[in-house]
Amino acid sequence: NGKDYRCHIVDCKPIAWLLRSGRNYENILMELLFLLLKDAAFAAIAGVGFGSISNLPKRAFPFCALIAGIGHSLRFFLINYADVHIIWASLAAGLTIGALSVFIGIGIKQPAESLSFPSLLPMIPGMYAYRTFLNLIKCISTRDESTFIHSFYLMSDNLLTGVIIIVMLGIGAVIPIMLFPRIAFGATRNITRY
């Protein structure tokens, strides 16, 4: 029916449009805060889960949850309210996660990579991978040329979007480590190994 169902509570329009719409500012901000906190909470849970299988020490779990929550809610905000494409929002979230991992890693004496990797995993675009393979199966199983072309187009679009999102997340997470190598690689110096 032509509607966009990205958000359920607040209309998915840029913030400027919402503020001009005549709605109460407090209601808009409370709904937005609720959505951001909900998104951050689910990303934090996923970040801790991925951190546990990445063999992070238990003392790093709260920081991994914090980094994952901030990064994912930033991407959610940029996509739904700042009208930024998911690729550029993923780059911004990757940069944020990378920077937070570098500077938090110093305080808890953990490598930035060990904090950023589990925090990035909740943002891997699973829906694009699913749609890629769904349309690949449609391409293989159809005999109609127009259906094949349409399915191939959708498969290519989803594949490219998913791959570019993953690349942007990786680039965004690596840039702060490369910009601050002394800080990033010095976080684990003077740690006795057991």
What are these model-derived regions, one by one?
Residues L29-F42, V84-L95:
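Structural signature of hydrophobic alpha-helical transmembrane segments
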Residues L33-F50, I67-L74, I171:
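Hydrophobic, membrane-facing alpha-helical anchors
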Residues R59-G69, I87-A93, E113-P122:
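Cytoplasmic-side transmembrane-helix entry/capping segments in multi-pass membrane proteins
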Residues R75-N80, G94-Q110, S116-P122, G126-M127:
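Short helix-perturbing small/polar motifs within transmembrane alpha-helices
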Residues T132-Y194:
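C-terminal membrane-adjacent module
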Residues Y25-E31, I45-K58, S73-V84, F152-Y153:
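Short juxtamembrane and helix-loop transition motifs at transmembrane-helix boundaries
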Residues I45-L56, A99-P111, I177-R182:
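C-terminal ends of transmembrane helices
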